[in-house]
């Protein structure tokens, strides 16, 4: 929340996007572009969302869904890292947001939350029930958690294999590597 608050003069009274860099998304149409189109439909605050297995829901912020409209859901609430078995849905919040300038006003009023920091999610949650509301958007694409070493490596391989100029060499290398690994077992 503090980083967004520091940008308030640049943002002014306009809707704005927040991109968390550890969430990398591969998509034919960029995730943020998909969300802008959805935002233009609703005018409401928008968070990217993806379905996760129940066993992994406790690792995410999870949406409490009011109404499911297909690619979008209206939100009753957000539960940060719910205890297993208590998650209100399997729809997890991912690091892409399009927010109204009202969120900045909410940030101005918020006291420090988790970890002694001003939490952006608290400011977004204050928009639930307003005329703007909060929506989850089920983006089309594949998300990689580059906040973990494994996720970073998965993204690197996936993006490498998606490129015409890298695919053949990378595929040959990975095939050889796996054959060597299997032979060593």
Regions found by a protein language model. Give the residues of each.
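Intrinsic disorder at enzyme termini
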Residues: 170-185
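Catalytic-core segments of class I nucleotidyltransferases/pyrophosphorylases
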Residues: 17, 36-40, 69-172
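Conserved beta-loop-beta/alpha segment of the NTase-like Rossmann-fold superfamily
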Residues: 1-65, 99-101, 107-110
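Alpha-helix boundary/capping detector
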Residues: 26, 33, 129, 153-154, ...
